[in-house]
A protein has these predicted regions:
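Conserved small-residue
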Residues: 15, 22, 50, 87, ...
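Condensing-enzyme catalytic core mediating Claisen C-C bond formation in acyl metabolism
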Residues: 61-136, 145
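Conserved catalytic cysteine-centered active-site region
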Residues: 1-21, 30, 53-78, 161-190
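Beta-strand segments within the central parallel beta-sheet cores of soluble alpha/beta enzyme folds
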Residues: 5-10, 31-39, 100-108, 141-148, ...
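Active-site-proximal alpha-helical scaffold in enzymes
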Residues: 5-40, 78-99, 184-205, 250
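Active-site-adjacent elements of ketosynthase-type condensing enzymes
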Residues: 41-67, 110-127, 151-163, 187, ...
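Flexible, low-complexity linker/loop segments at domain and module junctions
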Residues: 136-142, 219-256
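Short beta-strand-to-turn element immediately C-terminal to the catalytic PLP-Schiff-base lysine
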Residues: 86-90, 134, 164-165, 251-255
Length: 256
């Protein structure tokens, strides 16, 4: 805890950037162990900002029906709160102390649209995902599951799904975990990476809640809908995209 402190304050990508920066520090020999993650407390003023941007769902009287990422009837995000941390560690150090190893991060990328603060750019999202694949030495054919950012906003879902489809087509199962607990902003990258890893370990992947009819403007993907799916895979990709045009992509390998 007395080593490097790398604050990540990039809204919806803060948690995933923290994990990625910690991984890079260990990979380059600057650290042996790092605690990485994100946290977000539900704040009225924060909710007001999203309301002002017309980004939040209006289904206050039907909370079980929202958010509905990628659905043709989606009407915005639902703000959540939470926290999640991962212990990242150099492999030999973890083995030497007898640590339980859950998975291996093999790829990470982050970039910036350098365009508009609230209008995501599909092309830059795609580049970020491709860069994480290249870092991991993988191709699209190697991926077994994708954890989508999937906020249920109009432009965000369209841009993300189109970028994902440009790489994977409809060959890789994908779902949005925000449909269960809302958008936890700075925490979502850490929470979703951990949950996705646990699903891969169990071979059970949750569907996107409230997704019944994918929007035709969204990319043609293999959306997990209705029921969970049993998938035996070796790699997953966890993607997050933030206001400000910040993009992140993490690839995790199942530990045998």
């Amino acid at each position: 805890l007395r080593g490097r402190a790398i604050p990540a304050s990039s809204a919806c990508t803060a948690g995933s950037q923290a994990i990625g920066y910690a991984w890079e520090a260990i990979r380059h020999g600057y650290q042996t162990v790092m605690v990485a993650g994100g946290a977000e407390e539900l704040c009225p003023s924060e909710a007001a900002v999203f309301d002002t941007l017309f980004a939040t769902s209006q289904r206050n009287d039907e909370p079980k029906t929202t958010p509905s990422p990628f659905d043709t009837q989606r009407d915005g995000l639902v703000i959540g709160e939470g926290a999640g941390t991962l212990i990242l560690e150099e492999l030999e150090h973890a083995k030497a102390r007898g640590a339980t190893i859950y998975g291996e991060i093999v790829g990470f990328a982050t970039n910036c649209d350098a365009a508009h603060i609230t209008q995501p750019q599909r092309e830059t999202m795609q580049i970020c995902m491709e860069q994480s694949l290249a870092m991991a030495g993988l191709s699209a054919l190697d991926m077994g599951y994708i954890s989508a950012h999937g906020t249920a906003t109009d432009r965000g879902d369209i841009a993300e799904s189109q970028a994902t489809a440009a790489i994977y087509g409809d060959n890789v199962p994908i779902s949005s975990l925000k449909s269960y607990f809302g958008h936890t902003l700075g925490a979502c990258g850490a929470l979703e990476a951990w949950m996705s890893l646990q699903m891969m370990r169990e071979g059970w992947f949750a569907p996107t809640l409230n997704l019944r009819q994918p929007d035709e403007q969204c990319g043609a993907l293999d959306y997990i809908m209705g029921e969970a799916r049993q998938i035996d895979c070796e790699y997953l990709q966890s993607n997050n995209f933030a206001f400000g045009g910040i993009n992140t992509s993490i690839i995790i390998k199942r530990w045998a």
